[in-house]
Amino acid sequence: AVMGRNLALNIESRGYTVSIFNRSREKTEEVVAENPGKKLVPYYTVKEFVESLETPRRILLMVKAGAGTDAAIDSLKPYLDKGDIIIDGGNTFFQDTIRRNRELSAEGFNFIGTGVSGGEEGALKGPSIMPGGQKEAYELVAPILTKIAAVAEDGEPCVIYIGADGAGHYVKMVHNGIEYGDMQLIAEAYSLLKGGLNLSNEELATTFTEWNEGELSSYLIDITKDIFTKKDEEGKYLVDVILDEAANKGTGKWTSQSSLDLGEPLSLITESVFARYISSLKDQRVAASKVLSGPQAKLAGDKAEFVEKVRRALYLGKIVSYAQGFSQLRAASDEYNWDLNYGEIAKIFRAGCIIRAQFLQKITDAYAENKGIANLLLAPYFKNIADEYQQALRDVVAYAVQNGIPVPTFSAAVAYYDSYRSAVLPANLIQAQRDYFGAHTYKRT
């Protein structure tokens, strides 16, 4: 409801008169009452709402993904005319968007599945927008979407036509998976600095402030520096009294499930999903901590040196995560015939969204230089960073393993990097085993 309200206010602020409808009359009245003088026109029946719109109608749905979206579409259909456009701005599973696009197209309606990133504030002030559906329908809503989207530092709006049917929601799903990876990598860096150096919250804030002025400059690093020094009403550091159980809404899981369907090694992002799952086993972890032995963390030595190693490991881990995510976008584009433009996708993540970061420009540059590059790790900039930073990543992972500090995504980063650069892997033995017990056959070198 908040996302829908904020998007309506955003659209209204660009000079449009906006018809609004909610199943709850109270919520509709509340929005109007809270925003006097705004060009928000409330309607209390679907029929009146639909009939208030100019044709071709442009209807933005912001409802909970799943059955609720189908129910909302079904309630609209009796009052729609051919050529009307429904835009689904929810966190919808891309296969549902493909289905709805097909079904509505058959009835003469247009359907645009649209990823919207940036949370409640982004919805109001300018989100990153990822629309997918019929190109001609997108052209009819592009003027509105362009006006309400976030604007990058170079003045470009953070919205492009992504591709047919479910492409927009697929890109949003991978964006969310990358977000999971970024957050877990940052959490592991925090754990290493706290466990390896006993840094205070003030020192952590200072460290992250410095990091945010360099290669790691991003929204997530920026908010993390603030989180470290935020205190509760009792004067305690808030982060230290928050229970260590990370929730999830399932979009990271969808990204991992899709990687399995496509045969893509999305190991880092998948580990970040699993890290949230194991965090939720709090009671089991507390019990296991009293039974299972392991090393106690020893101090990591020179402070400045270790902080720099963790910074480098974090940046290279981030690069590996994005390399995996964009590799999956390529596989999906081939599978679903979307013809995705990876450099432009990286561009629209530069403002408005949760993963906005300075380094996204490097991804755009890499694809501008070589549109067909198989993996971002092979692009000159990222290859040079990997050459320079991999020792730090190895040292940090080795320290963590020796000292019993779990670093699932840092570990996944180095494992993927080494696997990807290996001309020969021990999979020949696995294939021999498969042939031995199941006559699966094999290829000779």
Swiss-Prot record:
Binding site for substrate: N91, S117, G118, G119, H175, N176, Y180, K249, R276, R434, H440
A Pfam family of this chain: 6PGD
Active site: K172 (proton acceptor), E179 (proton donor)
Known role: Catalyzes the oxidative decarboxylation of 6-phosphogluconate to ribulose 5-phosphate and CO(2), with concomitant reduction of NADP to NADPH.
InterPro entries assigned: 6-PGluconate_DH-like_C_sf (IPR008927), 6PGD_dom2 (IPR013328), 6PGDH_C (IPR006114), 6PGDH_Gnd/GntZ (IPR006113), 6PGDH_NADP-bd (IPR006115), 6PGdom_BS (IPR006184), NAD(P)-bd_dom_sf (IPR036291), Pgluconate_DH (IPR006183)
Keywords: Gluconate utilization, NADP, Oxidoreductase, Pentose shunt
Molecular function, one GO term: phosphogluconate dehydrogenase (decarboxylating) activity
EC number per UniProt: 1.1.1.44
Keyword Oxidoreductase: yes
Keyword set includes Transcription regulation: no
Species assigned in the record: Citrobacter freundii
Family, as annotated: Belongs to the 6-phosphogluconate dehydrogenase family.
Catalytic activity: 6-phospho-D-gluconate + NADP(+) = D-ribulose 5-phosphate + CO2 + NADPH
An annotated GO BP: organic acid catabolic process
PANTHER family: 6-PHOSPHOGLUCONATE DEHYDROGENASE (PTHR11811)
Involved pathway(s): Carbohydrate degradation; pentose phosphate pathway; D-ribulose 5-phosphate from D-glucose 6-phosphate (oxidative stage): step 3/3
UniProt name for this protein: 6-phosphogluconate dehydrogenase, decarboxylating
Subunit structure: Homodimer.
Annotated residues for binding of NADP(+): A1, V2, M3, G4, N22, R23, S24, V63, K64, A65, N91
